[in-house]
């Protein structure tokens, strides 16, 4: 910031993915949210993600080209979700929430659904990967987020990303 080093990235492992059970869903099924939901519904299973968490619903807004980011001043945030495509995104989220094959839930709910066999796909971060792999065994898979339909147009959902930083002491002689 302002040409000064305050920290550098140590990891970039705080994104999220689509985890799925290959015994229920094929690689092609999970490319589209519409197909994923139809196949999950036909199998009597659920697709899960948290809709009450801006971290995860960002994926819909980012797919529409909207942003929530740090302002140029490095202090304030900028969010343009209220622009024209934002209404389409909000409608797509509302439409998803009414699907019989969809269930909103936090990670603990998703883990419970995977372990209990009711969940065949979920959007979450790396912290549920072990549970999904253990529960689904050879049928475990993970991939990028699916496309979703916004006002009749397919858009690619996008993951947020987070970074762990190592801070730098500006007073040290080693900088």
Enumerate the language-model features and the residues they cover.
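Periplasmic solute-binding protein
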Residues: 1-31, 51-75, 160-169
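Short, well-ordered surface patches within globular domains
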Residues: 29-39
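Short loop->beta-strand "edge-of-pocket" segments that line small-molecule binding or catalytic clefts
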Residues: 37-50, 68
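Short helices/loops that flank or line small-molecule/ion binding pockets
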Residues: 38-42, 95, 108-122, 131
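Glycine-centered hinge/linker elements that transmit conformational signals in sensory
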Residues: 75-106
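Paired acidic/hydrophobic, glycine-rich loop segments that form the ligand-binding mouth/hinge
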Residues: 120-125, 141-143
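A ligand-binding cleft/hinge motif common to bilobed small-molecule-binding domains
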Residues: 126-139
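Extracytoplasmic/periplasmic substrate-recognition and gating elements
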Residues: 136-175
């Amino acid at each position: 910031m302002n040409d000064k080093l305050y920290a550098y990235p140590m990891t970039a492992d705080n994104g999220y993915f689509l985890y799925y059970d290959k015994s229920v869903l094929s690689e092609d099924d999970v490319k589209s949210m519409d197909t994923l939901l139809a196949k999950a519904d036909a199998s009597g299973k659920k697709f899960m993600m948290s809709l009450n968490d801006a971290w995860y619903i960002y994926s819909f807004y980012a797919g529409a080209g909207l942003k929530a980011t740090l302002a140029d001043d490095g202090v304030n945030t900028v969010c343009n979700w209220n622009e024209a495509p934002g209404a389409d995104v909000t409608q797509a989220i509302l439409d998803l929430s009414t699907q019989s094959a969809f269930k909103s839930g936090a990670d603990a709910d998703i883990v419970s659904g995977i372990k209990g066999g009711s969940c065949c796909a979920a959007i979450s971060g790396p912290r549920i990967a072990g549970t999904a792999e253990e529960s689904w065994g050879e049928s475990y898979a993970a991939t990028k987020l699916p496309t979703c339909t916004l006002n009749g147009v397919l858009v690619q959902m996008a993951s947020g990303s987070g970074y762990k930083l190592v801070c730098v002491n500006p007073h040290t002689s080693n900088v």
